């Protein structure tokens, strides 16, 4: 007679991200971002790009995987911080998900050690604080171009926050002895605490200030 599955295989009672951190108690306070921050229990945050060609498919990608994907990108030529193309320092991560995964995992360990809290919860707080609510767009009336303030969709708010967190981490370790994992952990902690030293949080304030002046 065959043995039950519980005796033949190890079945965990709780699935933890990267085998270390649970998402059960992670809370999203921003109601507009909540439907788009995927916190499903997942051991390995890697979907193999199965949502790439689906409309709004990114909403089904785990939030940790979306962060990993952001730090893998080198960015376009217009991504400039303090006059430098910061993300070009980390071309070794381009399309190398295993390396990017290890960087994020190490950053999460640093966050847990420094704050004593679940790093996924700290990441969610950082995203909420770094997601701008308003931006500007250009419209043309009578051959004259004007900048007007517009609301940002929740999906774009999330994208902008993650992009700026990745950019801020690259800026912090640019030409320094600080590792990318340490810089990423510091940027997430600063953004979660609404510290103006955070590039992502200060960028959000700048975007909203420009939008307010364009009303």
Swiss-Prot record:
Q: What is the top-level taxon of the source organism?
A: Archaea
Can you name one GO molecular function term for this protein? rRNA binding
Quote the SUPFAM superfamilies the UniProt record gives. Answer: Ribosomal protein S7
Q: Which GO terms describe its biological process?
A: translation
Tell me the keywords, alphabetical order.
Ribonucleoprotein, Ribosomal protein, RNA-binding, rRNA-binding
- GO CC field: small ribosomal subunit
Gene3D superfamilies this protein is in? Ribosomal protein S7 domain (1.10.455.10)
InterPro entries in the record: Ribosomal_uS7, Ribosomal_uS7_arc, Ribosomal_uS7_dom, Ribosomal_uS7_dom_sf, Ribosomal_uS7_euk/arc
Which NCBIfam families does UniProt cross-reference here?
Answer: PRK04027.1, uS7_euk_arch
User: Which family does the UniProt entry place this protein in?
Assistant: Belongs to the universal ribosomal protein uS7 family.
Q: What function does the entry list?
A: One of the primary rRNA binding proteins, it binds directly to 16S rRNA where it nucleates assembly of the head domain of the 30S subunit. Is located at the subunit interface close to the decoding center.
Oligomeric form and interacting partners: Part of the 30S ribosomal subunit.
Q: What is this protein called?
A: Small ribosomal subunit protein uS7
Q: Which organism is it from?
A: Pyrococcus abyssi (strain GE5 / Orsay)
């Amino acid at each position: 007679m065959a043995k039950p599955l519980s005796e033949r295989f190890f079945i965990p009672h709780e699935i933890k991200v990267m085998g270390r951190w649970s998402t059960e108690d992670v809370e999203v306070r921003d109601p507009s971002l909540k439907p788009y921050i995927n916190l499903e229990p997942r051991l390995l945050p890697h979907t193999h790009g199965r949502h790439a060609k689906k409309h709004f498919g990114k909403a089904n990608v785990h939030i940790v995987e979306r962060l990993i994907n952001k730090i893998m990108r080198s960015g376009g030529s217009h991504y400039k911080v303090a006059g430098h193309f910061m993300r070009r320092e980390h071309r070794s991560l381009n399309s190398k998900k295993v390396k990017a995964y290890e960087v994020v995992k190490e950053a999460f360990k640093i966050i847990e050690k420094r704050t004593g809290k679940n790093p996924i919860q700290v990441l969610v707080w950082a995203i909420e604080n770094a997601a701008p609510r308003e931006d500007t767009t250009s419209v043309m009336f009578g051959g004259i171009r004007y900048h007007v303030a517009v609301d940002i969709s929740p999906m774009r708010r999330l994208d902008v926050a993650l992009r700026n967190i990745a950019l801020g981490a690259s800026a912090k370790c640019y030409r320094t002895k600080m590792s990318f994992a340490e810089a990423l952990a510091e940027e997430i902690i600063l953004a979660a605490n609404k510290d103006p030293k955070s590039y992502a949080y200060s960028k959000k304030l700048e975007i909203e200030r420009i939008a307010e002046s364009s009303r």
